[in-house]
Every structure is written in C-alpha cells, then in structure tokens.
Design a protein with these regions (language model features):
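Positively charged n-region of N-terminal signal peptides that target proteins for export
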Residues: 1-4
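Amphipathic alpha-helical segments and their boundaries
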Residues: 23-40
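Alpha-helical segments in soluble extracytoplasmic regions
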Residues: 36-100, 120
Length: 144
C-alpha cells in the first residue's frame, strides 16, 4: 500500500512538472505570435503609406491605386484585430478601413490627412489614432 502511495505521489509530481512546462511553452509561444502580428501590422502600415504616396503622386489610373490602398488597409485592419490589448487602436483602424470602403469620394479628398495619420501611427504616436477619430467624425456619413 505504501509503495502505491509513493508511486502515485511521484507520478503526480511528474505530471505537475510536465503541466507547468507546457504552460510555460504556451505563454512563450503566445508572446511570439503577438510579436509576429505586431510586425505584420507595421509592415502593412508601410504598404498603406506607399499606396497613399503612390496615389497622391500619380497622374494615371487612380482607381487601381485606390483599390490597392483599400486592400492594404484591410490587411492592417485584420492584423489590428489579432493584437491583444489594442482595443482603441482597433476601432480607429477599423473606422478608417470602413470609411475607405463606404465613402470613397469623401476619402479621396482627405488622403493627405490620412497619410499624416498613418505616418503618426507607424511612428507609434497616439495622436495618429486621435486624428483618425477626428477624420472619421469629419465625414458626412449620410452622403457618398
């Protein structure tokens, strides 16, 4: 009986150690995944900046450039929603993405302002998100 008890305690200790190791590995992997999401978010913000510059400096085919801008902004939006503890920033990015899709005529007139906002966000400045909310508030949401 004593042997069974000792072996049960040893097995319990080994199981507890294994559980702690797996929990540690899970936490470490979660941090790595979040770092990957953040780096992809930054990379896609860079693509949006390039698309904005391309649109603003172009003379031809602006429709194709705008579609590319919307596509890259959708990627930024997707990665923003994967990042933990990023709620207010997610709202700002989502609203910009929605405005680009729903109000293209209005947003085309505000792309220089949007470029400054994206630049501030890329540089980790909170004023970028604040200005994004101001930009969205300035839109006529009943119009096109």
């Amino acid at each position: 009986m004593k042997r069974r008890m000792v072996s049960a305690i040893i097995i319990s200790i080994i199981t507890l150690i294994a559980l702690l190791v797996f929990i540690g590995l899970y936490v470490d992997e979660s941090k790595r995944v979040q770092e990957t999401y953040r780096s992809q978010y930054k990379i896609n913000l860079g693509h949006v900046r390039e698309d904005l510059d391309s649109y603003l400096n172009s003379e031809g085919d602006r429709d194709m450039r705008y579609v590319r801008l919307v596509s890259d902004m959708s990627s930024v939006n997707s990665f923003a929603f994967l990042i933990n503890d990023f709620t207010e920033e997610q709202k700002a990015i989502n609203q910009i993405n929605t405005a680009l899709i729903k109000y293209p005529d209005q947003m085309r007139t505000k792309l220089e302002e949007l470029r400054d906002i994206v630049e501030d966000i890329s540089n980790d400045l909170d004023k970028g998100y604040d200005n994004a909310f101001k930009l969205i508030e300035s839109l006529n949401k009943k119009g096109t």
